[in-house]
């Protein structure tokens, strides 16, 4: 319905995961219950045939923290290491919402840091600082820093979800149409849709 968000289908070994992603503000603005948004997605002509005959085995909802680096809490304390959603390790990049990869990597790093702290006999905040150091050296914090302002950019640039994807579609379509006519140059094929968006 033109709302900021997205949907996904993940193929697993024996199951398929189907879901939607919507910001709280869009859910309120759209005035459509989240479960109805999911049903609307499942009933799309591109999706319905893929899941037809499937049996619902699990249903869940999850609020994803989009605070990112700016809202990240202290990552270590006495006897505590924080990772994943609890540490605001999530990024909305417009085309995807990342979090699972960051949580898994941070969890692995947390395990290594905890093992080091236990071996050293020091699970205090100071003894667990190696987690922060290892995390800073990993792709997790590098990516969190790289994309820390992206949520604000997305909110200020709604064209990312409508006009730009349509522009890309309009550029790509003529490249794959065989109609017996000579092809325009790539530049000419691209310029019309680009000018239309501005």
PLM regions and their residue ranges:
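C-terminal auxiliary extensions adjacent to catalytic cores
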Residues: 154-198
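FAD-binding beta-loop-beta segment adjacent to the flavin cofactor pocket
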Residues: 62-94, 136, 141-144, 159-160
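Generic structural "secondary-structure junction" signal
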Residues: 53, 66, 71, 95, ...
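C-terminal catalytic lobe of FAD-dependent flavoproteins
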Residues: 12, 28-50, 72-93, 98-105, ...
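A general structural signal for short secondary-structure boundary/capping elements
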Residues: 53-58, 65-67, 125-128, 176-183, ...
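Conserved FAD/dinucleotide-binding core of flavoprotein oxidoreductases
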Residues: 2-63, 98, 116, 120, ...
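An acidic- and aromatic-residue-enriched active-site/binding cleft used to recognize and process polar
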Residues: 21-23, 86, 149
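Active-site-proximal substrate-binding core of FAD-dependent oxidoreductases
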Residues: 90, 108-162
